[in-house]
């Protein structure tokens, strides 16, 4: 499964040689959102896909900030831009840049004596993580981080905006959303469900 991903063919080859069922990319994105995009494209072939993540903690982006010199800890929130979401829901099929779809907000605990201006600049200019987004950086205490940012919520939604009719006169929106109190717990629940399915499929030959 998942042969479209770079590692897919190798996983598939190993599974076939071992006479097992392989699974990859079975979280929620890639994973559940991927399945939603697949069936939405089949139902509305004349349309566009849109994906928004958040509001929630991005563990990868938080870790990227922690690697900056002078940073003790961080929580980074990915936030959908409401104006962009509403534009998609309206059926206008907008062309949206990365910056227009999401903002990023960082709550950073700095080491004592660290150069805060340097840290903020490094965050905002970090390629592949923050440079393409409008990013806000807040410096807070370790106590504030533990009190106000001690959970790992996340979520997001996938929309397919499409048209039908002889003159494309009818507009449709398919929207699938997740609102998660605990991203790790929800993701592990998906993986366990897929593991059960893989085991059953393997047992059935």
Identify the residue ranges that each predicted region occupies.
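General beta-strand structural signal in soluble alpha/beta enzymes
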Residues: 22-26, 52, 75-76
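Short beta-strand and adjoining strand-loop segment in the mid-core
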Residues: 42-43, 47-54, 105-110
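Rossmann-fold NAD(P)-binding glycine/threonine-rich loop
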Residues: 1-22
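Gly/Ser/Thr-rich loops at beta-strand to alpha-helix junctions
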Residues: 2-5, 25-34, 55-59, 112-113, ...
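Short alpha-helices
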Residues: 19-41, 191
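C-terminal helix-rich "cap/oligomerization" subdomain common to oxidoreductases
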Residues: 197-205
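Oxidoreductase and adenylate-handling cofactor-binding alpha/beta cores
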Residues: 12, 32-48, 63-73, 197
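C-terminal substrate-binding/catalytic lobe of Rossmann-fold NAD(P)-dependent oxidoreductases
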Residues: 58-195
């Amino acid at each position: 499964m998942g042969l479209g991903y770079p590692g897919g063919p190798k996983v598939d080859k190993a599974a076939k040689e071992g006479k097992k069922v392989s699974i990859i990319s079975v979280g929620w994105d890639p994973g559940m959102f991927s399945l939603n995009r697949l069936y939405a494209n089949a139902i509305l072939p004349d349309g566009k896909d849109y994906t928004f993540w958040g509001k929630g903690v991005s563990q990868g982006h938080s870790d990227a900030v922690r690697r900056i010199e002078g940073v003790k800890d961080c929580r980074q929130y990915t936030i959908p831009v409401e104006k962009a979401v509403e534009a998609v829901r309206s059926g206008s099929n907008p062309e949206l840049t990365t910056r227009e779809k999401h903002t990023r907000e960082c709550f950073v605990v700095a080491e004592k004596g660290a150069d805060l201006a340097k840290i903020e600049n490094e965050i905002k200019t970090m390629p592949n993580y923050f440079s393409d987004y409008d990013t806000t950086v807040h410096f807070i205490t370790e106590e504030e981080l533990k009190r106000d940012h001690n959970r790992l919520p996340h979520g997001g939604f996938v929309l397919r905006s499409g048209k039908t009719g002889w003159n494309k006169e009818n507009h449709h929106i398919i929207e699938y959303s997740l609102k998660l109190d605990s991203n790790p717990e929800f993701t592990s629940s998906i993986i366990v469900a897929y593991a059960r399915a893989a085991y059953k499929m393997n047992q059935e030959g």
